Swiss-Prot record:
Example GO molecular function: unfolded protein binding
Protein name: Co-chaperonin GroES
Organism: Klebsiella pneumoniae subsp. pneumoniae (strain ATCC 700721 / MGH 78578)
Family annotation (SMART domains): Cpn10 (SM00883)
Compartments (UniProt record): Cytoplasm
Organism phylogeny: Bacteria, Pseudomonadati, Pseudomonadota, Gammaproteobacteria, Enterobacterales
BP GO annotations: chaperone cofactor-dependent protein refolding
Subunit organization: Heptamer of 7 subunits arranged in a ring. Interacts with the chaperonin GroEL.
Gene3D superfamilies: GroES chaperonin
Function: Together with the chaperonin GroEL, plays an essential role in assisting protein folding. The GroEL-GroES system forms a nano-cage that allows encapsulation of the non-native substrate proteins and provides a physical environment optimized to promote and accelerate protein folding. GroES binds to the apical surface of the GroEL ring, thereby capping the opening of the GroEL channel.
Length: 97
């Protein structure tokens, strides 16, 4: 299935978080926090400004990002994979190699 977000929305596939503590203890359940890093897998066309022009997004498909996992983030299952749909404003940073 193909999915295309609208306007300033992006679709992110969450990256797996390390499940071991610094001391080597395997974390489970609530002790294993969900990662706030992910890969952009789709982007909308951009934010519509008051004058009607479209401002392109700063992120692109393939970017690794750090995001705010909060109120505006919607979790969906696409082709048996969990993805996150969020506005670009919930992205805090792009991880550069």
């Amino acid at each position: 299935m193909s999915i295309r977000p609208l306007h300033d929305r992006v679709i992110v596939k969450r990256k797996e978080v390390e499940t071991k503590s610094a001391g080597g203890i395997v974390l489970t359940g609530s002790a294993a926090a969900k990662s706030t890093r992910g890969e952009i897998i789709a982007v909308g066309k951009g934010r519509i400004l008051e004058n009607g022009t479209v401002q392109p997004l700063d992120v692109k498909v393939g970017d690794i990002v750090i995001f705010n996992d909060g109120y505006g983030v919607k979790t969906e299952k696409i082709d048996n994979e969990e993805v996150l749909i969020m506005p670009e404003s919930d992205i805090l940073a792009i991880v550069e190699a």
